[in-house]
Amino acid sequence: STSRGLGDVYKRQVIKPLVKQPTAFAIITDNQTYANTKDAMHQYKTAVEDDGLATYLISGDWQNPDQVKQIIIKTYQECPSLEGLVLIGDVPVALVRNAQHMTTAFKMNEKAFPWDQSSVPTDRFYDDLNLKFEFIRQDSVNHQHFYYKLTEDSPQRLNPTFYSARIKYPEKKEGDKYAAIASYLKKAAAAKADKHNQLDRVFSFNGASYNSDCLIVWMDDEKAYMENFPLAFGRQMGFKHWNFRMKHPMKYKLFSELQRKDLDLFMFHEHGMPTGQLINDELACTDFNNRYKMLKSTLYNAVMSHVGKRDKDTLRIQMQEKRQVNEVFFKDLDNPKFWEADSLHYADERIVTEDLMKRNLSTNPKMIMFDACYNGSFHENDYIAGQYIFNDGQTLVAQGNTRNVLQDRWTIEMIGLLSHGVRAGQYNKLIVSLEGHLFGDPTFRFAPIEANTLSTDITIHKDDKAYWKNLLNSPYADVQSLAMRMLADADTQKELSPLLLKKYRESGFNTVRMEAIKLLSRYQDDNFIEALREGLNDTYEMVARQSAIYAGFVGDDSLLPAIVEALVEHNERLRVQMSANKALSLYPKEKVEKTIEDFYAKVDRLNENEEKKRLLRSLERMFVQEAKVHQTLMDVAAPEAKRISAIRNVRNYTFHFHVDDYLNVIRDAGNPQEVRVVMAEALGWFTNSVQRPHILEEIKKMQQTANLPEDLKAELEQTIKRLSL
């Protein structure tokens, strides 16, 4: 039956589910959006219920995010099988501070930069009820934005209670936003009638400068895709795998692909900004004319970038002398036709929201992934992901980030679950980050390869170990990975580590091996170290790369020979090389140099002495730089700002061998309070370090110190929570 609850201060209305189902879903919107899209909203609600989810429809005149959260908590208490929610229209946005360790890469100084830039817009405020937040203030310009701080005594890891998504119209698109939202909801409702569309048409594109343009990364992705999307392989044109090198400009070919009505999933692996996607970089110049054009554009732009600071003619003459060109070279400096052609050339290298609006482009892939920075910036008045769901095409779901994101993240983790009828939101919840969001209908799903009940069982059998053990030998890689994840989540006694190492060693599935290593990182035992040692030489580039990254995070000396071998023997893997190089910089200099000497004593390589010297020289530069930074960090006479900058560097470079020095900085009451607090925060990044137990023990002792400043006490508490397994 339908019931309405009215009469509270923000005119809340709750329409309860019309049907009983094993699990439930909530649609949350504001009263104005509801009033203007009522018919479409109810069509969507009915379609979701027909697809197996008991559905609540909740609207209100929300004054702040806490009011929305209260109704979510109330609904969850009433219905513990609530699995997900969608926020439609003008639902307040929480911008979170003091939680950068929950992002993949965002590390902006919250004290030095404006709040709207240094906070993270995130719906984890709504979907992760384990987290504790403290309200700070409403934004003075955008009244839909509210700042919160993650409290120090909150859990410090993401563990969402539900999945979530936003359906938020990009205001810059103009037009009637309510008509656009209604149109989208009708599209999403109508799509549910197709119960037979399997995930068998997939497109993957790698943009310029992504993952160092490494061709091994691009090639090895296909090893995973064959496991993720078995139906897309072995049939005509089921899978396309492009990268930017294939065409310049590539964007117009991509526009054609985006209009294919048979396409199920489109993955953009690229760099981005809120309103743009980087597709190509500068064209490689292979003939004289193109080289001349490139030189002309570069020097003309160099002159114009300084106009205003100095006179244009003076700048031109200086450039002629500096670059040894004559006056005729600059004859087009004031020619509008040159600048028009130049700007078109630059524009061809990017897809921007203006392109999509001007062309009124209909995008048709059912789901689109943007693993770039900022493409999911729904808090802005325009954002890439929003443009792809609000058009006349068939796109129902987009995945994007509100802040910058780590390139080396395993972006396609678990994506193959979509091949097995798992809902888009359920998949996204498994790979959660503070900045990562879904846009559109999170209940969307493809028809499974084989009939199953996975999408319900993820909620209903969450803690049923016997159920998940039974799926460990599924014929499908992603189902095995899901089973391992569910077992690890339920492993309160920390007993699963031997099984995960066994899985790593025995599985022929690349993605299962990668999931095993990721889960072993929770255990930080000998099995994890052993998996890393073998993983550095794994046939799947992503396993080798993540093993190199973890090897740096861990700092276990026994890994040094394997890191050096990966660095030298596999230099075609550019991201593995970069990660191994960084990892070596986090180990003591003498041990690294000895390992390199030992390695070269045993191998036969062309010009091995010269190669060894080059490697030692490049590492020496890193060690010298590190020693300088550490000296500044420890120097009580150095300016406070410089010391803090050196300490903040430790968040990215966890020098395990300096931990005792770092602890002394915190202990020393003679240090400025801010230096001690920032140092305590930096130690929270040693989550995988061999020094973690030692750090924990020492800072727990510090907590007992008399007259500890409140800020420092709070930071120590947060660091203890971050480092506790």
Where in this protein do the model-derived segments appear?
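Short inter-helical turns and helix N-cap capping residues of alpha-solenoid HEAT/ARM repeat scaffolds
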Residues: 475-476, 508-509, 539-541, 571-573, ...
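Amphipathic alpha-helical scaffolding segments comprising HEAT/armadillo-like alpha-solenoid repeats
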Residues: 461-470, 491-504, 525-536, 556-568, ...
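Catalytic cores of nucleophile-dependent amide-cleaving enzymes
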Residues: 118-184, 293-410
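Structural detector for internal amphipathic alpha-helices that build alpha-solenoid repeat scaffolds
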Residues: 478-491, 511-523, 544-556, 575-590, ...
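Structured catalytic cores of large enzymes
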Residues: 1, 8-19, 47, 65-248, ...
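Caspase-like cysteine protease fold
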Residues: 411-494, 510-518
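Acidic, contiguous N-terminal accessory segments
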Residues: 8-50, 55-60
